[in-house]
């Protein structure tokens, strides 16, 4: 038994229910028995929300009570009002005139926002999926008032079929004609490959899709059920069928909604030859063209000829190599590129410090040992879990800042920027919960010169200095040319960034550092109180060759080597050799002025005196002739009597032997040094032989005990 059936009955079930009625409409109650259908039960007006769950009723009918002769509206059993036939006639006139009619849903239960006017009587429930109407002449219309249909704004089609309306046709049989949708045209080839004259075919819609109403694809529309197609081209359908029945030749107004949900026609195509992109509007076309790069504008000069314009490309991301135009994604990848592509040593350093004080002291020491000054390149970045990362780069890395173009500009200060990216950097990781700091970076430079005075050699660099020392001891002319020195030092380390003047000026200091480290290694095993030498010292596999003229009492004299290397740089005399007391310049440059022999002799005398003072200052009592003339060695390089002495040597023994006065060379050739100098001798005689007549005075001034 039905719980409740909201039905409203009239006097007839035919077309006469459109006639003017004299009474207001009421809602009647029924227990579902056909015998009680003729009885009308008067009830007070009921709003929409007070209606019980009556939506399961098998059908609902419209009832029009007798009125005063003017029908205002029709009311369903659920309280939904519909326009009367006279309003439908007005709607027809609006349709024929091409006016736009907006159909919107009433908002039931919204108090205080009721819209006035005839437009509010049109409810979107007539567009609900479950709407199905039989012939109006049958006198019953089934409605779905669930209120689940969405709000929408709908535009009626234009009056293209206005001449087909029959004015004498009864209002109950009035139907809204459907409009033929425009056919879509597609070419057989893409627009970018079009050569003209291609075959154009019309897209045929699938019959099954065409038969479907908008309700099955979009959940909205007149057709809740499928119905057979009509072969008649007449837009007016039979009265026995639904209100609107779609077919291939007759489409419903809701077909526009179906077409709107389908893909629109591709009106725009990419002009590129290898691109098959299609679009529907101009904005999407412009957005797609950015993929192929911006279009270069055509600029014409005064004569009307096109000028070639080169647009500035965006700056690529990454770190640019200082030796080439390659960009690396990160600093560690840049170091790998420097070694693989250019053969430049770029060691990656990783260290950990307990606190900031230790890190600061280490950074201060880098200024003196590696000639590097780090500056902050960017602000700190926060990673996951509060980890902060700071990036530091070399102070000379980067380009100079552009000065603003103003009327008055201050004189620019000299900038230390080299215009390239130096590969020296530091990345500091700091954890807020832990006090230690993790360091990762590179201490070697690239792209600019470095200060040679702030450069303490590393183990591999000291090995290169040792190779030069060994070559000099073997008699190889290494110091005769700067290019030869660089060939021994190599072009992959920090030596490549030192200028020629800096290399010559710093070479004596590096020689002393080499001998100091070798002495510490052979003796105590400590290096200037800086701690023990690591086990991985490269000197363990390198044998130290003894000096040619016996055990060297003194390291290389900085003053002597400096003057020799300065003469190499000034291209005056390289090398200086003696033959029987006669000074000769074997590689004199003819373009330079004549060499002054007196100046060289004075300088050599001064160097001889200073070297002798150093020997006497070290150990005057144990002074022996072998120390002065180098007779203790197995190889004697003192050649006299017209034979050439060896080239310029960097040891003090060879310099003293080569710089003896002229009157001492001839008698020395016939002397037995072991016999003549084995006993004691007078100081005056020795001074006279060496040409140091004022030696005693100098000795007294030195106060050597």
Curated annotation (Swiss-Prot):
Disruption phenotype: RNAi-mediated knockdown reduces expression of homeobox protein lin-39 in vulval precursor cells at the larval L3 stage. InterPro entries: RegFact_GeneExpr_CellDeath (IPR052797), Znf_C2H2_type (IPR013087). Keywords: Metal-binding, Repeat, Zinc, Zinc-finger. It comes from the Eukaryota. The keyword Metal-binding applies. A zinc finger (C2H2-type) spans 268-292, 319-342. The keyword Repeat applies. It comes from Caenorhabditis elegans. Probable transcription factor. Positively modulates expression of homeobox protein lin-39, perhaps by binding to regulatory regions of the lin-39 gene, acting in the vulval lineage. GO terms for cellular component: chromatin; PcG protein complex; transcription regulator complex. This is Zinc finger transcription factor family protein 17. GO terms for biological process: regulation of transcription by RNA polymerase II. One of its GO terms (molecular function) is zinc ion binding. Residues 215-239 are annotated as: Disordered.
């Amino acid at each position: 038994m039905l719980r409740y059936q909201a039905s409203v009955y009239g006097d007839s079930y035919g077309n006469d229910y459109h006639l003017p009625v004299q009474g207001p409409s009421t809602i009647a109650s029924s227990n579902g028995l056909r015998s009680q259908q003729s009885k009308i039960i008067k009830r007070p007006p009921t709003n929409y929300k007070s209606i019980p769950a009556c939506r399961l009723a098998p059908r609902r009918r419209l009832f029009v009570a007798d009125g005063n002769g003017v029908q205002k509206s029709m009311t369903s059993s659920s309280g939904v009002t519909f326009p009367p036939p006279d309003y439908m006639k007005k709607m027809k006139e609006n349709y024929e005139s091409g006016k736009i009619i907006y159909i919107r849903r009433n908002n039931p239960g919204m108090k205080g926002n009721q819209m006035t006017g005839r437009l509010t009587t049109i409810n979107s429930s007539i567009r609900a999926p479950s709407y199905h109407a039989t012939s109006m002449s049958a006198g019953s219309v089934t409605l779905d008032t669930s209120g689940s249909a969405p709000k929408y704004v709908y535009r009626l089609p234009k009056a293209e079929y206005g001449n087909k309306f029959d004015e004498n046709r009864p209002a109950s049989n009035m139907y809204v004609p459907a409009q033929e949708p425009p056919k879509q045209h597609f070419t057989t080839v893409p627009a970018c490959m079009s050569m003209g004259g291609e075959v154009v075919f019309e897209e045929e819609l699938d019959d099954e899709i065409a038969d479907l109403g908008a309700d099955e694809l979009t959940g909205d529309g007149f057709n809740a059920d499928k119905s057979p197609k009509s072969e008649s081209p007449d837009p007016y359908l039979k009265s026995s069928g639904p209100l609107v029945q779609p077919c291939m030749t007759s489409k419903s107004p809701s077909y526009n909604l179906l077409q709107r949900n389908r893909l629109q026609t591709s009106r725009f195509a990419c002009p590129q030859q290898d691109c098959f992109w299609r679009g529907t509007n101009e904005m999407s076309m412009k957005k797609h063209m950015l993929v192929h790069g911006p279009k270069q504008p055509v600029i014409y000069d005064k004569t009307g000829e096109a000028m070639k314009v080169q647009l500035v490309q965006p700056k690529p991301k990454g770190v640019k190599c200082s030796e080439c135009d390659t960009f690396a994604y990160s600093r560690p990848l840049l170091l790998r590129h420097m070694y693989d592509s250019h053969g430049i040593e770029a060691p990656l350093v990783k260290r950990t410090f307990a606190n900031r004080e230790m890190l600061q002291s280490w950074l201060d020491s880098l200024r003196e040992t590696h000639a590097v000054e780090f500056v902050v390149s960017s602000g700190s970045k926060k990673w996951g879990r509060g980890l902060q990362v700071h990036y530091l780069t070399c102070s000379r890395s980067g380009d100079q800042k552009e000065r603003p173009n103003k009327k008055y500009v201050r004189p620019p200060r000299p900038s230390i920027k080299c215009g390239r990216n130096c590969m020296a950097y530091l990345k500091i990781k700091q954890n807020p919960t832990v006090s230690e700091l993790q360091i990762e970076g590179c201490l070697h430079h690239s792209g600019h010169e470095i200060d040679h005075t702030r450069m303490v050699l590393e183990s591999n660099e000291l090995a290169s200095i040792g190779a030069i020392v060994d070559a000099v001891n073997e008699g190889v002319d290494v110091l005769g040319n700067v290019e030869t020195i660089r060939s021994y030092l190599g072009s992959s380390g920090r030596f490549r960034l030192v200028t020629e003047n800096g290399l010559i000026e710093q070479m004596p200091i590096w020689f002393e550092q080499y001998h100091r480290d070798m002495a510490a290694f052979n003796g105590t095993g400590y290096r200037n109180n800086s701690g023990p030498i690591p086990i991985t010292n490269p000197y363990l596999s390198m044998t130290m060759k003894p000096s040619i003229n016996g055990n060297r009492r003194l390291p290389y004299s900085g003053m002597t080597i400096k003057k020799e290397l300065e003469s190499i740089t000034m291209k005056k005399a390289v090398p200086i050799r003696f033959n029987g007391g006669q000074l000769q310049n074997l590689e004199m440059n003819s373009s330079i002025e004549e060499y002054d022999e007196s100046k060289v002799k004075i300088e050599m005398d001064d160097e001889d005196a200073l070297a002798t003072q150093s020997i006497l200052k070290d150990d005057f009592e144990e002074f022996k002739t072998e120390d002065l003339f180098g007779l203790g060695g197995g190889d004697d390089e003192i050649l006299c009597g017209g034979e050439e002495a060896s080239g310029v040597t960097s040891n003090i023994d060879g310099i003293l032997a080569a710089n003896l006065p002229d009157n001492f060379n001839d008698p020395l050739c016939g002397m037995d040094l072991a016999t003549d100098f084995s006993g004691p001798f007078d100081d005056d005689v020795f001074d006279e032989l060496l040409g140091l007549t004022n030696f005693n005075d100098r000795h007294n001034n030195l106060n050597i005990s």
